[in-house]
């Protein structure tokens, strides 16, 4: 059965909902682990005032009993505490009080095109759903996908490798142990010196009323070879990873392995040579492909990078047009963050976890998690899989 993850809710509405459907029964979930993932999404130097209001916690309203999944859809809810300050403006039902419409779309946001597409006169009807606040629901759902993957021996991590012009040294030798303390960095960067430079860059540009983008990297370890397929374009795992990560607000580019870098080197330097011995089975000494060849996982660590643009909500707004009068105006001023690349990495983990969980469900099925494990073990035996 295919796995689905659906979210609902607006940024300043009563709350956010996530429905995850397609996971087997018998999977153990830890409430504290789910809440830790939500807390991680709120990390990062450069966050705005809303993080002082929201202390995200997940409430499970379906699909789980006594800490185990039932095989039915899993319903997760995250309350928006800030709704108390927006109750009249964001009420689902008509209110007596007058609420002013927003007519000033922000360049780089969904505001203008959203009002055109859906025939709306109030930009808030677009921006509330388009907001990255929606990713809290994705992280809640992704945390369940992570639990499923962990039950099958797969772990997913992320770290920040660039903020504007500050880039951390490249590391190709990372292991799961290297990520144990990544969240201790205020920008979730593994390099101490790069962390200091990134923090300084955020502080410098924030004083200039600027926002900052950057690049985060997601790595998955313990992934079995053969997830995805070469036979149909829509089953190619690299395509599915790209779509999932590009769906995150403000993400503009995705690369797998060496990505765009291979366009500038000859073929002998672009691919991973294949070797074999009795102890290791098939193996590669390099991982330029990032764990994906021909639309399928190779069994090497999955390495995916996503590039995030600076946030379009600026404290010094860009030029825009009032959609009610068509007169020139400054774009909407809205409470915002300066830099959310560290948090976006956590969202990236959730989306990669969802894609991998769906791939495992598609390939190994199972009504109960034990059925899935048995199918996975049989597959590993058939292909002579050795852990890497």
Residue map of PLM features:
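Generic N-terminal targeting/processing segments that precede catalytic cores or assembly contacts
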Residues: 1-388
């Amino acid at each position: 059965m295919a796995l689905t993850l659906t979210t609902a809710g607006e940024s300043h509405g009563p709350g956010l909902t996530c429905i995850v459907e397609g996971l087997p029964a018998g999977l153990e979930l830890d409430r504290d682990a789910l809440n830790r993932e939500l807390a991680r999404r709120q990390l990062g130097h450069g966050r705005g005032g809303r993080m002082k209001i929201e202390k995200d916690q997940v409430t499970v309203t379906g699909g789980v009993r006594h800490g185990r999944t039932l095989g039915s859809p899993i319903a997760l809810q995250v309350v928006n505490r800030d709704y108390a300050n927006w109750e009249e403006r964001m009420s689902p039902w008509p209110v007596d009080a007058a609420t002013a419409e927003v007519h000033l779309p922000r360049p780089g946001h969904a505001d203008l095109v959203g009002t055109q597409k859906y025939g709306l006169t109030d930009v808030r009807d677009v921006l509330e759903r388009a907001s990255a606040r929606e990713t809290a629901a994705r992280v809640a759902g992704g945390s369940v996908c992570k639990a499923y993957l962990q039950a099958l021996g797969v772990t997913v991590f992320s770290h920040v490798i660039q903020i504007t012009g500050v880039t951390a040294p490249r590391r190709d030798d990372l292991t799961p142990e290297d990520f144990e303390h990544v969240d201790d960095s205020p920008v979730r960067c593994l390099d101490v010196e790069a962390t200091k430079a990134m923090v300084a860059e955020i502080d410098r540009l924030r004083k200039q009323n600027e926002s900052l983008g950057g690049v985060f990297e997601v790595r998955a370890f313990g992934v079995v070879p053969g997830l995805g397929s070469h036979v149909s374009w829509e089953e190619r795992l690299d395509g599915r990873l790209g779509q999932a990560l590009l769906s995150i607000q403000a993400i503009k580019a995705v690369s797998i392995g060496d990505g765009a870098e291979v366009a500038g080197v000859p073929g002998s330097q672009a691919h991973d040579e294949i070797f074999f011995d009795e102890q290791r089975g098939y193996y590669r000494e390099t991982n330029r492909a990032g764990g994906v060849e021909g639309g399928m996982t190779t069994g090497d660590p999955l390495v995916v990078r996503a590039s995030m643009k600076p946030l379009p909500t600026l404290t010094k707004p860009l030029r825009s047009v009032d959609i009610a009068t068509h007169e020139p105006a400054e774009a909407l001023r809205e409470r915002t963050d300066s830099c959310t690349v560290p948090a976006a990495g956590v969202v990236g983990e959730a989306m990669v976890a969802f894609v991998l969980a769906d791939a495992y469900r598609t390939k190994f099925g199972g009504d109960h998690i034990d059925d899935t494990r048995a199918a996975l073990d049989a597959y590993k035996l058939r292909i002579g899989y050795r852990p890497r």
